[in-house]
Amino acid sequence: GHRIVHGGELFSKSVLIDDNVIKGIDSLSSLAPLHNPPNLQGILAMKSLLPEVAQVAVFDTAFHQTMPETAYMYAIPLKWYEKYGVRKYGFHGTSHLYVTRRAAAMLKKDIKDTNFISLHIGNGVSVTACKGGKSIDTSMGFTPLDGAIMGTRCGSIDPAVPLFMIDKEGFSSEEVNTILNKRSGVLAVTGRYTDRRDIARVASEGDKFCQLAQNMEAYKLKK
């Protein structure tokens, strides 16, 4: 099995990998340039090493393909969606799928009769509203950068902030992308930590920035 970050609108469930699936994953590389190409390399390597073994692609975005248009469309020029696929996709789908099914089983409820809010909290963080076992909205968007504050990702901010900083500091789009994905989040607030255990320990010792990071993250999750 291969965890594939982006299945776009092509894949709404896990699939057996064949040549058409490989082409489909490759066609979505522009939506996940850091993840889909390496995923493909892994698939092709296993196909070469073990050609007789069936391979399955499990897509991080698939669970969220049940979101309604009102949840996944953005109020931006329609051409951006039609030509480039710009919309909310959501991520951590495999995690949210498992959690909702497991929670229903623990509560001894039919999954169709449940309403859950599922939280995936690690270095990446996402929140998903699930109705009847299906995703109806989620915090991550076009990329995993959107939503809650994360270890190194900023989460939701005013879209004008990157444009403002490009104007002020002369950053390239690649530099801004790196800053928002790799140098932001609780790392930026604390100045040194991404591990919440370290943050909790130092916060208990009175460090105001670790305390602030905890409070900001909790506030954003509740919001």
Question: What kind of region is each of these model predictions?
Answer:
Residues 65-168:
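Glycine-rich phosphate-binding loop of actin/hexokinase-like ATP-binding domains
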Residues 178, 185-189, 196-222:
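Adenine-nucleotide phosphate-binding core of ATP-dependent small-molecule kinases
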Residues 22-27, 77-84, 201-209:
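Gly-rich Lys/Arg/Thr-decorated short loops/hinges at beta-loop-alpha junctions or inter-strand turns
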Residues 1-35, 54-56, 62-73:
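Short beta-strand-loop/turn "lid" adjacent to the catalytic site in phosphate-handling enzymes
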Residues 46, 59:
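Active-site pocket-lining segments that scaffold enzyme catalytic pockets across diverse folds
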Residues 24-42, 49, 83-86, 95-97:
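A gly/proline- and charged-residue-enriched helix-loop-helix capping module
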Residues 166-192:
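Oxyanion-binding "anion nests"
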